């Protein structure tokens, strides 16, 4: 007979340390917003009352990368801005995650020229891509939910226990 049966309806929760840490990490992400173009307007809309990102523990945007664990890159990244994005990413504490919001952040979008980075994954590792030009706030929220699922499947050393299959 396991502890689950012995505890009955006492309100006791049994979980591993890894599950508790991942639950707290996924429910209290503090974003560092990097709005570079029109996607930033939709990102701001996602924080309004209609969509309310605070229900995901993201009600406060961090101005300092040392206080953030999630970077949302929204829009095109120029070659001159690339070192700044990398420096801010390096200043974030581990564990840290990145969402590339919009087609420009994911692959350069319509700006296929020498001055624009053809995807922010050339600069920093990206965990979730949110497609659209610009993506709606619902798409950003869907990307955040997918990131939460990924974080909940991580080991304490930062590797995935199992692959994440998104529908």
Curated annotation (Swiss-Prot):
Binding site for [4Fe-4S] cluster: 38-39, 104, 133
Biological process, per Gene Ontology: aerobic respiration; electron transport coupled proton transport
Native organism: Roseiflexus castenholzii (strain DSM 13941 / HLO8)
Record's protein name: NADH-quinone oxidoreductase subunit B 1
Note describing how the cofactor binds: Binds 1 [4Fe-4S] cluster.
GO molecular function term, any single one: iron ion binding
NCBIfam families for this protein: nuoB_fam, PRK06411.1
Translocase listed as a keyword: yes
Keyword Magnesium belongs to the record: no
Reactions catalysed: a quinone + NADH + 5 H(+)(in) = a quinol + NAD(+) + 4 H(+)(out)
Family matches, as Pfam families: Oxidored_q6
Disulfide bonds: none
Known cofactor(s): [4Fe-4S] cluster
Family: Belongs to the complex I 20 kDa subunit family.
UniProt subunit comment: NDH-1 is composed of 14 different subunits. Subunits NuoB, C, D, E, F, and G constitute the peripheral sector of the complex.
Topological relation to the membrane, as annotated: Peripheral membrane protein
GO cellular component: plasma membrane; respiratory chain complex I
Purpose of the protein: NDH-1 shuttles electrons from NADH, via FMN and iron-sulfur (Fe-S) centers, to quinones in the respiratory chain. The immediate electron acceptor for the enzyme in this species is believed to be ubiquinone. Couples the redox reaction to proton translocation (for every two electrons transferred, four hydrogen ions are translocated across the cytoplasmic membrane), and thus conserves the redox energy in a proton gradient.
Assigned keywords, A-Z: 4Fe-4S, Cell membrane, Iron, Iron-sulfur, Membrane, Metal-binding, NAD, Quinone, Translocase, Transport, Ubiquinone
EC code: 7.1.1.-
Subcellular location per the Swiss-Prot or TrEMBL entry: Cell membrane
